[in-house]
């Protein structure tokens, strides 16, 4: 089992990255909450990982924090929640926000996540309620910090918007829905990661 990888970031195409670990390129899928914490391409990063083995593919998921991976593992134990849906949930909410929604039984917030219907949301409440008592309420609504713009990042609104739309579709949103979400928040000075962050924030 691969539990942790440290290497040089070669490519970023949300929600996927390519990580060079001693000459071997690992493709990883990251929730957007972890994607926001990535350094620039060419820099070193460390990720906690979870390997999902299927008949047709081996999928490697990466997380900036151990708590994100822990929640991911709890989610995929839930009936009806696969790795891709767990990725969408962790992209839409931080661990703290998800914990708060579960403890407060906020079904309406959970069902706004693509792929989470009423039955799945109810199942999540039943199976996960009470597991987040150690999470501080003061952490629930911490404002996300803005990612600084860098000259090495393409900041043209069109390419950023296109990348953001593709990422949202990969996370389970319908193309028309993804396009609407991006149009509501896109600005010329924003990177694709910032557009995705704002779009997901508005969606909830």
UniProtKB/Swiss-Prot annotation:
Region (Flexible linker) residue spans: 144-155
Domain II, as annotated region: 65-143
Annotated HAMAP family: DNA_HJ_migration_RuvA
Region (Domain III), start-end ranges: 156-204
Subunit structure: Homotetramer. Forms an RuvA(8)-RuvB(12)-Holliday junction (HJ) complex. HJ DNA is sandwiched between 2 RuvA tetramers; dsDNA enters through RuvA and exits via RuvB. An RuvB hexamer assembles on each DNA strand where it exits the tetramer. Each RuvB hexamer is contacted by two RuvA subunits (via domain III) on 2 adjacent RuvB subunits; this complex drives branch migration. In the full resolvosome a probable DNA-RuvA(4)-RuvB(12)-RuvC(2) complex forms which resolves the HJ.
Database matches in Pfam families: HHH_5, RuvA_C, RuvA_N
Organism: Haemophilus influenzae (strain ATCC 51907 / DSM 11121 / KW20 / Rd)
Presence of the UniProt keyword Nucleotide-binding in the record: no
Family recorded in the similarity comment: Belongs to the RuvA family.
UniProt GO molecular function: ATP binding; four-way junction DNA binding; four-way junction helicase activity
GO cellular component terms given for this protein: cytoplasm; Holliday junction helicase complex; Holliday junction resolvase complex
Region ranges (Domain I): 1-64
Listed name of the protein: Holliday junction branch migration complex subunit RuvA
Keyword vocabulary terms for this entry: Cytoplasm, DNA damage, DNA recombination, DNA repair, DNA-binding
Domain notes: Has three domains with a flexible linker between the domains II and III and assumes an 'L' shape. Domain III is highly mobile and contacts RuvB.
Compartment(s) where it occurs, according to its Swiss-Prot or TrEMBL record: Cytoplasm
SUPFAM superfamilies per the UniProt record, alphabetical: DNA helicase RuvA subunit, C-terminal domain, Nucleic acid-binding proteins, RuvA domain 2-like
Gene Ontology biological process terms from the UniProt entry: DNA recombination; DNA repair; SOS response
Domain of life: Bacteria
UniProt keyword DNA repair, yes or no: yes
Role noted for this protein: The RuvA-RuvB-RuvC complex processes Holliday junction (HJ) DNA during genetic recombination and DNA repair, while the RuvA-RuvB complex plays an important role in the rescue of blocked DNA replication forks via replication fork reversal (RFR). RuvA specifically binds to HJ cruciform DNA, conferring on it an open structure. The RuvB hexamer acts as an ATP-dependent pump, pulling dsDNA into and through the RuvAB complex. HJ branch migration allows RuvC to scan DNA until it finds its consensus sequence, where it cleaves and resolves the cruciform DNA.
InterPro entries named in the record: DNA_helicase_Holl-junc_RuvA_I, Hlx-hairpin-Hlx_DNA-bd_motif, NA-bd_OB-fold, RuvA, RuvA_2-like, RuvA_C, RuvA_C_sf
């Amino acid at each position: 089992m691969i539990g942790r990888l440290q290497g040089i970031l070669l490519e970023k195409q949300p929600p996927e990255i390519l990580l060079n670990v001693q000459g071997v390129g690992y493709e990883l899928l990251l929730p957007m909450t972890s994607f926001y914490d990535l350094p620039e391409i060419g820099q070193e990063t460390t990720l906690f990982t979870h390997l999902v083995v299927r008949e047709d593919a081996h999928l490697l998921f990466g997380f900036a924090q151990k708590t994100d991976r822990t929640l991911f593992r709890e989610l995929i134990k839930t009936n009806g929640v696969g790795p891709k849906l767990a990725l969408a949930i962790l992209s839409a909410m931080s661990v703290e926000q998800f914990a708060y929604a579960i403890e407060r039984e906020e079904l309406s917030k959970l069902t706004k996540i693509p792929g989470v219907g009423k039955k799945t949301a109810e199942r999540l409440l039943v199976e996960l309620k009470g597991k987040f008592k150690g999470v501080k309420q003061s952490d629930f609504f911490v404002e996300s910090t803005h990612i600084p713009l860098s000259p090495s990042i393409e900041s043209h609104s069109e390419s950023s918007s296109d990348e953001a739309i593709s990422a949202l579709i990969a996370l389970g949103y319908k193309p028309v829905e993804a396009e609407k979400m991006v149009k509501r928040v896109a600005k010329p000075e924003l990177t694709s990661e910032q557009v995705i962050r704002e779009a997901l924030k508005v969606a909830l």
